[in-house]
Amino acid sequence: MDEKLSRVDPKLLDLLVCPLSKGRLSYDREHNELVSEKARLAYPIRDGIPIMLMSEARRLDD
């Protein structure tokens, strides 16, 4: 994966929230996803763009 596309600007993380829980997101570099611990969802990042659709999110296993 392109190193430039596998990073998320910390300022972006300050602005984005989970569309379901409205909670903060964290970046999972291994899976290239934005994670909402509160909603237990992971939103994919494709071509450097976060896909903030619940229909595209992956449920986190316990």
Swiss-Prot record:
InterPro entries: Trm112-like. SUPFAM superfamilies: Trm112p-like. Pfam families: Trm112p. It comes from the Bacteria. One of its GO terms (cellular component) is cytosol. Belongs to the UPF0434 family. This is UPF0434 protein RL4569. It comes from Rhizobium johnstonii (strain DSM 114642 / LMG 32736 / 3841).
